[in-house]
C-alpha cells in the first residue's frame, strides 16, 4: 500500500492481495508473479505458479480486470540448474509466456539465481567445465536482446547471484580434537560441524587446507567429522596425508548460507571475521548460551 512491489508465489497470496486491493480502491498496487516450469534439471520445484495451469491463466485474467492492480514483472527461481542449457530454457520459457499472454508492459523479468561463480581448483575439477559470467550473459542477454529488438517497452533484466558471488570468499576454521579408528576406518573429530559449512560438504569434496601444529602420522582415507551426535555430520570424506591432534583445518568455498544455517545444537554458533587492510575485524560475535535461551520462558514455581 506504500509503493512496494509484491511478488506472488501462490493462489492464497494472490487472493489476499485482491482483497486488499478491493478494500483500498484508491491505492495502486504493483505485483510480480513467480512462475514455475520445467527446465529439464530433474527437480520438481515447489515454488511459484505452474505456468501451464488454468490457475495461472485465471490469475492473469483477474489482474487485467482489477483496475488498481498492475502486473509489473515475472520471476523465475530454481535450484540446481547452473548449466547454460538450463539458463537458456529459463529465459526462453519466460519470453514464451510474455509472447503467449501478450505481457507487453512488464517492467522487469527476474531469472533468479543459480550460476557458477569463481571456484577453488579442487571444486573446479569436480564440477568440470563451468560457464563464466560472460557465457551466462551471452545466452540470457542475447535472447532478451533479440526478443525485444523491435518492441517499444523493454523490461529490466534481473538475476540474483548472491551465493554465486560470495561463496569463494567464505572460509571456516576448525581444529582437530581427536583421531580414532573403528574397524580399520579413521575418523578425525573437529570442533566444528557440517552446519558451519553448509550443504556443499554433502555434495562435493570441499577445498581444505591443513596447518600442521606438530609432526603427525600419515593416514589413509580419513573422514573429518563434526562434534554433533548425527552420523551425517561429515565435513570431508577420504582424506589421505599427514595429520595430528591439534592441527588447524581451513575449509574453503563454503558459501553464504553457512553463516546463517547453524542451528543452536550442541554448541553455540561461531564468530565471523572479515579481512580488511591486512587486519581481521569481527563483524559477527560468537553466540552465547544466553543468546540461545533468551526466547525461552522459564516459570519458577515454589516448592
Residue ranges: model-predicted function:
Residues 91-158:
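Acidic, glycine-rich loop-and-beta core segments that form the ion-binding/anion-interacting portion
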Residues 152-303:
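Charged (often Lys/Glu-rich) extended helix/loop segments that serve as interaction or gating elements
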Residues 13-16, 55-59, 70, 86, ...:
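General structural feature for long, well-ordered alpha-helical segments within catalytic domains
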Residues 32-34, 75, 110, 158, ...:
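Conserved beta-strand segments that form the floor/walls of ligand-binding pockets within enzyme
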Residues 83-90, 119-134, 167-175, 236-239:
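Short glycine/threonine-rich loop-to-helix capping motif typified by GTGT followed
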Residues 35-39, 78-82, 113-117, 163-165, ...:
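Glycine-rich beta-alpha junction loops
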Residues 1-108, 117, 148:
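Active-site-proximal beta-alpha core segment in soluble small-molecule metabolic enzymes
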Amino acid at each position: 500500500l506504500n509503493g512496494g512491489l509484491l511478488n506472488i508465489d501462490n493462489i492464497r497470496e494472490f487472493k489476499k492481495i485482491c482483497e486488499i486491493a478491493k478494500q483500498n480502491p484508491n491505492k495502486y498496487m504493483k505485483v510480480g508473479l513467480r512462475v514455475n516450469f520445467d527446465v529439464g534439471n530433474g527437480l520438481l520445484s515447489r515454488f511459484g505458479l505452474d505456468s501451464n495451469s488454468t490457475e495461472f491463466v485465471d490469475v492473469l485474467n483477474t489482474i487485467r480486470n482489477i483496475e488498481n492492480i498492475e502486473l509489473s514483472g515475472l520471476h523465475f527461481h530454481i535450484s540446481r540448474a547452473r548449466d547454460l542449457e538450463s539458463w537458456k530454457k529459463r529465459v526462453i520459457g519466460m519470453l514464451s509466456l510474455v509472447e503467449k499472454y501478450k505481457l507487453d508492459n512488464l517492467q522487469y523479468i527476474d531469472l533468479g539465481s543459480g550460476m557458477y561463480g569463481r571456484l577453488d581448483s579442487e571444486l573446479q575439477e569436480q564440477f568440470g567445465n563451468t560457464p563464466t559470467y560472460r557465457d551466462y550473459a551471452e545466452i540470457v542477454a542475447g535472447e532478451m536482446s533479440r526478443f525485444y529488438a523491435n518492441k517499444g517497452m523493454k523490461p529490466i533484466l534481473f538475476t540474483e547471484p548472491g551465493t554465486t558471488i560470495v561463496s569463494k570468499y567464505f572460509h571456516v576454521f576448525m581444529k582437530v580434537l581427536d583421531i580414532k579408528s573403528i574397524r580399520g576406518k579413521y575418523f578425525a573429530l573437529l570442533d566444528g560441524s557440517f552446519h558451519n559449512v553448509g550443504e556443499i560438504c554433502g555434495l562435493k569434496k570441499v577445498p581444505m587446507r591443513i596447518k600442521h601444529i606438530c609432526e603427525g602420522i600419515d593416514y589413509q582415507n580419513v573422514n573429518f567429522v563434526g562434534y554433533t551426535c548425527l552420523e551425517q555430520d561429515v565435513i570431508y570424506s577420504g582424506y589421505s596425508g599427514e595429520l595430528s591432534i591439534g592441527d588447524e583445518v581451513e575449509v574453503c568455498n563454503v558459501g553464504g548460507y553457512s553463516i546463517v544455517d547453524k542451528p543452536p545444537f550442541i554448541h553455540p554458533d561461531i564468530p565471523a571475521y572479515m579481512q580488511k587492510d591486512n587486519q581481521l575485524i569481527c563483524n559477527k560475535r560468537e553466540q552465547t548460551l544466553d543468546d540461545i535461551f533468551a526466547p525461552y520462558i522459564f516459570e519458577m514455581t515454589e516448592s
